[in-house]
Design a protein with these regions (language model features):
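Active-site-proximal loop/turn and secondary-structure-junction residues that shape catalytic pockets
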Residues: 1, 26-28, 61-64, 106-108, ...
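Histidine-acidic metal/acid-base catalytic patches
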Residues: 1-18, 42, 49, 96, ...
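Active-site acidic/histidine proton-transfer and metal-coordination neighborhood
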Residues: 5-9, 47-51, 67-173, 183
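Residue-level detector of anion-binding/catalytic polar loops
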Residues: 20-21, 54, 98, 140, ...
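Glycine-rich, proline-tolerant flexible connector loops at the mouths of alpha/beta enzymes
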Residues: 25-48, 104, 111
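Flexible, glycine- and charge-enriched loops at secondary-structure boundaries
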Residues: 34-41, 74-78, 113-120, 153, ...
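Conserved alpha-helical segments that form or flank metal/cofactor-binding pockets of metalloenzymes
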Residues: 47, 55-58
């Protein structure tokens, strides 16, 4: 959200507003994750600690990269992507993050002529192959179901849970995103949340269908907060937005006001 601020400035703003952690999109640091220098990684750790925060982890993992794709039938591209996940895990570990949110809708969508089963097999192999390294690094990989307007692969939380169960590794879990759950239509967002055990959730994004933060649109967070409490989820609720006007600080302030109102 704070793409135009330095990382240290972002941490300072987040801390002053009452946030407890920050998520990092790798492309905001360098063109590729392996381009983030050791000095940058050290400065990230220092900026986070200086402001009394924690690094939650990484998201938007493949955003603004080229030649990478999770379900591609192209063997060369597939191998590059597998290797790149190892690079991302190293980055997440180095900045002391614990989760990697696998959204990247365009880089996972099935290509023309590819069946769902073929794409599924590719995804299972991709993520299963990364899980042991993630475990060693103390990182949990989180598959993020996304709406059909964004991708044609893994659109529902039920599909995300199915993938999680097939991979069957403690460091691979499902990610919940309010905007994406709203896109499912039915069941309701609270009922989708209730369909998931807290121990199967790796991370949780809060936002609105209008692409702003929680409380800035039509989604009612009262029933969502109740469902979150019912299943016993007591870890991160992380603000993710896609519109930045009037300005990121205002959005961050309004978002945390909503979270405090319903979740405190």
């Amino acid at each position: 959200m704070f793409e135009k601020n330095s990382f240290r400035e972002t941490c300072e703003i987040a801390s002053k507003l009452g946030y407890q952690g920050v998520e990092i999109a790798p492309y905001t640091l360098a063109a590729t994750a392996d381009g983030v220098t050791a000095e940058q990684r050290a400065e990230i750790r220092k900026a986070v600690k200086d402001n009394g925060l924690q690094t939650v982890g990484l998201h938007w993992l493949l955003a603004k990269t080229t030649g990478l794709h999770i379900t591609t039938p192209d063997d060369s591209m597939y191998r590059r992507t597998k290797d790149y996940f190892n690079v991302l895990i190293d980055l997440c570990h180095d900045v002391e993050g614990n989760v990697m949110v696998i959204g990247s809708p365009k880089q996972r969508s099935l290509v023309d002529g590819q069946s769902y089963e073929q794409g599924w097999k590719r995804a299972v192999e991709m993520f299963r192959g990364a899980c042991d390294k993630a475990s060693d690094a103390g990182v949990t990989l989180c598959i993020e179901p996304l709406g059909k307007t964004e991708t044609n692969f893994i659109n529902t939380v039920a599909e995300g849970l199915k993938l999680m169960r097939e991979i069957n590794h403690p460091n691979f879990k499902v990610h919940l995103d309010v905007k994406a759950m709203a896109a499912e239509g039915k069941p309701s967002i609270p009922d989708i949340i209730r369909s998931v055990r807290a121990q199967d959730i790796g991370h949780f994004h809060v936002n609105d269908s209008n692409l702003y933060g929680p409380g800035m649109g039509a989604i009612d967070y009262g029933p969502i907060a109740l469902a979150v409490r019912e299943i016993g989820w007591n870890k991160w609720l992380s603000v993710e937005v896609f519109k930045f006007d009037p300005d990121p600080t205002t959005i961050a302030r309004k978002s945390i006001e909503c979270l405090k109102r319903y979740f405190s």
